């Protein structure tokens, strides 16, 4: 895996202060090691000019961002999600998926609600010349992708996978949630896998989904 460094200009502490930063400097699909925790990358995603689908394994993080940004962002609330699968912190113990069987019920009403809300939100942002920001867990990314495709605007969005190191955790990587999520990302025009956690290069090389992806490191110290 070939790593490329992007030197952060001197005096910059947060991504939002970097005037020349944009996703256009990266290929459509790549790994971004921001290296410095708390550098404001997530905030840039939610305040920058791009239309962004921000994917996170942690519901609480998404809820906190929704509370901070209010109507400027749209938080996908899918009642059919299984908390044990999507709220994945690698420090938490692993649960047996058989212990949390999904509740089988008709999800058409939930889909219709999400379709209406996402359509309404994105249209209003467009009318106001504002970028759209959609917050979603790995589990519900497929729904967002499907709705935006039906609206004819999916290719107007960039997909950012925050804290993607959670996908690499041995046991969890084998779960259906992550495997399905990676399948849908493969069908997406953009996928930016972002983390500040040191990557295990040998491990990434073993995974078909990541071994051929360009790898970028933000250099804050040169």
Spans of features found by a protein language model:
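Pre-Walker A adenine-sensing motif
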Residues: 2-27
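Hydrophobic anchor at the beta1->P-loop junction of P-loop NTPases
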Residues: 33
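Conserved Walker A/P-loop ATP-binding site and its immediately adjacent core
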Residues: 37, 41-100, 139, 202
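Residues immediately C-terminal
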Residues: 61, 166-169, 199
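Conserved helicase motor
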Residues: 78-88, 106-121, 137-143
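Conserved two-lobed SF2 helicase motor
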Residues: 127-146
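SF2 helicase catalytic motif II
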Residues: 138-140, 150-185, 190-192
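Interdomain hinge/linker at the junction between the two RecA-like core domains of SF2 helicases
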Residues: 198-222
């Amino acid at each position: 895996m070939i790593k490329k460094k992007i030197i952060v200009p001197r005096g910059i502490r947060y991504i939002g202060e970097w005037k020349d930063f944009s996703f256009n400097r990266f290929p459509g699909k790549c790994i971004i090691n921001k290296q410095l925790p708390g550098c404001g990358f997530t905030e840039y995603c939610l305040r920058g000019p791009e239309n962004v689908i921000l994917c996170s394994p942690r519901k609480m993080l998404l809820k906190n961002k929704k509370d901070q940004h209010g109507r400027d962002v749209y938080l996908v609330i899918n009642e059919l999600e299984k908390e044990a699968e999507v709220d994945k912190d690698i420090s938490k113990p692993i649960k047996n998926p058989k212990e949390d069987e999904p509740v089988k019920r008709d999800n058409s009403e939930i889909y219709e609600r999400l379709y209406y809300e996402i359509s309404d939100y994105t249209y209003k942002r467009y009318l106001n010349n504002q970028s759209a920001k959609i917050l979603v867990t790995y589990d519900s990314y497929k729904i967002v992708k499907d709705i935006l495709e039906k609206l004819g605007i999916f290719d107007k969005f960039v997909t950012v996978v925050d804290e993607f190191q959670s996908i690499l955790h041995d046991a969890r990587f084998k779960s259906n949630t992550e495997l399905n999520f990676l399948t849908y990302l493969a069908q997406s025009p953009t996928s930016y896998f972002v983390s500040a956690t040191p990557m295990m290069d040998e491990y990434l090389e073993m995974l078909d989904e990541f071994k051929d992806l360009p790898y970028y490191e933000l250099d804050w110290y040169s």
